[in-house]
From Swiss-Prot:
Record-annotated active site: 128 (for gatase activity), 221 (for gatase activity), 223 (for gatase activity)
Gene3D superfamilies in the cross-refs: 3.30.300.10, 3.40.50.880, HUPs
Top-level taxon of origin: Eukaryota
Catalytic activity: XMP + L-glutamine + ATP + H2O = GMP + L-glutamate + AMP + diphosphate + 2 H(+)
Subunit field text: Homodimer.
Domain GMPS ATP-PPase: 248-457
CDD domains documented for this protein: GATase1_GMP_Synthase, GMP_synthase_C
Classification lineage: Eukaryota, Amoebozoa, Evosea, Eumycetozoa, Dictyostelia
Official protein name in the record: GMP synthase [glutamine-hydrolyzing]
Record EC number: 6.3.5.2
Keyword Ligase: yes
Any single GO CC term annotated in Swiss-Prot or TrEMBL for this entry: phagocytic vesicle
InterPro entries cross-referenced by the UniProt entry: Class_I_gatase-like, GATASE, GMP_synth_C, GMP_synth_GATase, GMPS_ATP_PPase_dom, NAD/GMP_synthase, Rossmann-like_a/b/a_fold
SUPFAM superfamilies (UniProt xref): Adenine nucleotide alpha hydrolases-like, Class I glutamine amidotransferase-like, GMP synthetase C-terminal dimerisation domain
Length: 718
């Protein structure tokens, strides 16, 4: 295993412009779907190269009052222009998204040959992969980096001879800007006619332009919240470069959703799966408004993995909508359920370790239970539509073709399994929120008259606690010793003699480039935990190690050097790619509770864990403690989501487990940051949470605090 990627050179340059390359198609081979066409006088076309963030680009454009459409990269653009012109619509510009492939790779997505031709003659904004493609096609060079750039970085915008920022794209921005970078390839030779407009803090080309052609490219992601002024960059491209009039308003989105519901459902019944969370509640309220509450059947399925007293709270919350609510206790059905994946029958859910299989079993079982309830009501399944509060991030992370045909699967969401896709393809699934992100759903909920207590409930995944319990029969130890040596040296400067000097030199060089210095007096130490969590890096899925950090001085919570901890949490996954999540392990003094000390020895033991009743009750208890404190300290609105996770790490006490807490802050759940103790969450709140868990939940060795941004860690651990 290596911690860096080899340099892979692109094929030899045969011509100035590679429009005859194997990446092009004569005309797009994807049929244009009328449902993807927006009725607006001006439109920006977003070409999806497989990015997890394509719909976020779409959202940013809409926020600036410009209509947008997402199409596959290989759509027939000239045919699309014809279709748009017939309806009186003009395409004003094109945005090419990022993606997980390399422009020189065998699996690089194809694009329509007219994209960069004079026939099209439209401004183009290439993001990440889009910039690399633009540079490569015009004769530049793209190579694999010696190390990835993943996470928040600063870029330096270049100035011209008059000391003005060199590009229209960056008008009214600062010379130094914070951005999100997630890439393993970089532009190493600029194509003729293009110029560099910004560089990263690592000195890597982060932006190029050809002003004459109206082509602009950035290596970072301006669409996500972690890029501080990304929205301004989009505004500069849309208004100043493309000349959009910005007269497309979003006021009618609720009415559009109602029209969509009526057009699909007509006079039939709709079965709404309601968990009690904001997504399903808003979905139920919207459908009720569209077709009347008498035509809506609200079904709450208790799958056995709910929060403490969840089903009772759901009944109270949904009674205000005046819906016909059915509550079904299907816990035993779920525990014993199986499904078929690629022709293979899975084990029962209670025996399943794989998080992906668990999600698929749960999703398919939801559908089967729902169909059974329809039959009990005397309704024919073909006369009933299924409604779900599916959001855009769910479809993106599941790589649904509704959003993208080429995005990597990060995780399967319970509301986007293969069975749901079959129902969707047959036209029997209604998903009025599929173009919405979480904060937009909350705004819609307010406009529908829902109370704050409903709109601001902490999000809870449909599969429930089943995906907040990390199951394992044995420790994960693939390349454990090497990885442990790497992080020991990275954090402390000390490592076993087995770690080669060449690796140490690389680590020191990377730490210097990232401006991350080790402590003068080493008090923070790492411990590699032998389990895996799900992450997203470079538009792709990772299933990698969890790393713990702890204080050797047993500092209290307010004495912990949090800024240094978060710096390590950003740095470690960038250098050691088989770690995607970093947690801080609270010590004895930090929790004011006599508990188990973290050993300096490698952790190579776990408590075998499955979805058994005792494990579920243990997590329910811990989760309820966290929820109580969130309400007590008025953190329900400021913390977007707080997953509480059971880990099979015993820290030397046979049979024990540990609890991890992820205090996550985000607008759209596509990217986000952890809450900072003492700033976003008080020391007292953390103190009470950890003390209460350790004193009142039996069998818990440690409480861990997640310090990881998204990316590289996903919102949930699994």
């Amino acid at each position: 295993m290596t911690i860096t990627s080899p340099v892979i050179k692109t094929p030899p340059l045969n011509s100035e412009i590679r429009l005859e390359s194997n990446l092009t198609v004569e005309s797009g081979d994807i049929e244009i779907n009328e449902k993807d066409i927006v009725n607006a006088s001006e439109v920006i076309v977003i070409l999806d190269a497989g990015s997890q963030y394509s719909k976020v680009i779409d959202r940013r454009v809409r926020e600036l009052n410009v209509a947008s459409e997402i199409h596959p990269l290989n759509i027939d653009l000239l045919e699309l222009i014809k279709i748009k012109s017939k309806s009186g619509s003009t395409i004003k510009g094109i945005i090419i998204s990022g993606g997980p492939e390399s422009v020189y790779g065998e699996n690089a997505p194809k694009f329509d040959k007219s994209l960069f031709s004079e026939k099209l003659n439209l401004p183009i904004f290439g993001i990440c992969y889009g910039m690399q493609l633009m540079n490569y096609i015009f004769g530049g060079k793209v190579e694999s980096n010696s190390q990835r750039e993943d996470g928040v970085h600063n870029i330096e915008i270049l100035k011209d001879e008059n000391q003005q920022l060199v590009s229209k794209l960056f008008k009214n921005l600062n010379q130094t800007e914070q951005v999100l970078l997630t890439h393993g390839d970089s532009v190493t030779k600029i194509a003729d006619g293009f110029k560099i407009i910004c560089k990263s803090d690592d000195g890597i080309v982060s932006g190029i332009e050809n002003e004459r052609l109206g082509y602009y490219g950035v290596q970072f992601h301006p669409e996500v919240d972690l890029t501080t002024n990304g929205k301004k960059m989009f505004s500069n491209f849309l208004i100043d470069i493309c000349g959009c009039s910005a007269n497309y308003t979003l006021d009618d989105r609720e009415q559009q959703a109602i029209t969509y519901i009526k057009s699909i459902v007509s006079n039939k019944k709709v079965l709404v799966l309601v968990s009690g969370g904001v997504d399903s509640t808003v979905c139920a309220a919207l459908i009720s408004k569209a077709i009347g509450p008498e035509n809506v059947i609200a079904l709450h399925i208790d799958n056995g993995f709910m929060r403490k007293d969840e089903s009772l709270n759901v009944e109270k919350a949904l009674s205000v909508l005046g819906l016909h609510l059915i509550v079904v206790d299907a816990s035993q059905t779920f525990y014993n359920s199986t499904t078929t994946i690629k022709g293979h029958l899975t084990s029962s859910l209670k025996e399943t370790i794989s998080p992906e299989e668990r999600r698929k079993i749960i999703g398919d079982t939801f559908m089967r239970v729902a169909e059974n309830e329809v039959k009990k009501l005397g309704l024919q399944p073909e006369d009933v539509y299924l409604a779900q509060g599916t959001l855009r991030p769910d479809l993106i992370e599941s790589s649904s073709k509704t959003v993208s045909g080429v995005a990597d699967v990060i995780k399967t969401h319970h509301n986007d399994t293969e069975l749901v896709r079959i129902l969707r393809d047959s036209g029997r699934v209604v998903e009025p929120l599929k173009d919405y992100h979480k904060d937009e759903v909350r705004e819609l909920g307010k406009s529908l008259g829902l109370s704050d207590s409903l709109v601001w409930r902490q999000p809870f995944p449909g599969p429930g606690l089943a995906i907040r319990i990390i199951c394992a029969d044995e420790p994960y130890l693939v390349n454990y010793d090497f990885t442990n040596n790497v992080v020991q040296y990275l954090v402390t400067g000390e490592a076993s003699s087995e770690l080669e000097s060449e690796v140490k030199i690389k680590i020191d060089k990377q730490l210097t480039e990232m401006k991350c210095k080790r402590q003068d007096k080493i008090t923070i130490k790492p411990v590699l935990l032998p389990i895996q969590t799900v992450g997203v890096q470079g538009d792709g899925r990772t299933y990698s190690y969890l790393l713990g950090l702890y204080s050797s001085e047993n500092s209290t919570i307010d004495q912990i050097p949090w800024s240094y901890i978060f710096n390590l949490a950003r740095t470690i996954p960038k250098i050691c790619h088989n770690i995607n999540r970093v947690v801080f392990i609270f010590s004895q003094n930090a929790t004011k509770h006599t508990n188990i000390k973290v050993s300096n020895e490698p952790v190579k033991h776990i408590t075998p864990t499955r979805l058994t009743p005792d494990v579920i009750k243990q997590l329910q208890h811990a989760d309820s403690i966290v929820s109580e404190q969130l309400y007590k300290y008025n953190l329900i609105k400021s913390l977007s989501q707080v997953p509480v996770v059971s880990l099979p790490i015993d820290f030397g006490v046979t049979g024990n487990r540990s609890i991890a807490i992820r205090t996550f802050i985000t607008n759209d759940f596509m990217t986000g940051v952890p809450a900072i103790p003492g700033k976003n969450i008080s020391f007292d709140c953390l103190q009470e949470i950890t003390n209460n868990i350790l004193t009142s939940v039996n069998g818990i060795s440690k409480v861990l605090f997640d310090c990881t941004s998204k990316p590289p860690g996903t919102t949930e651990f699994l």
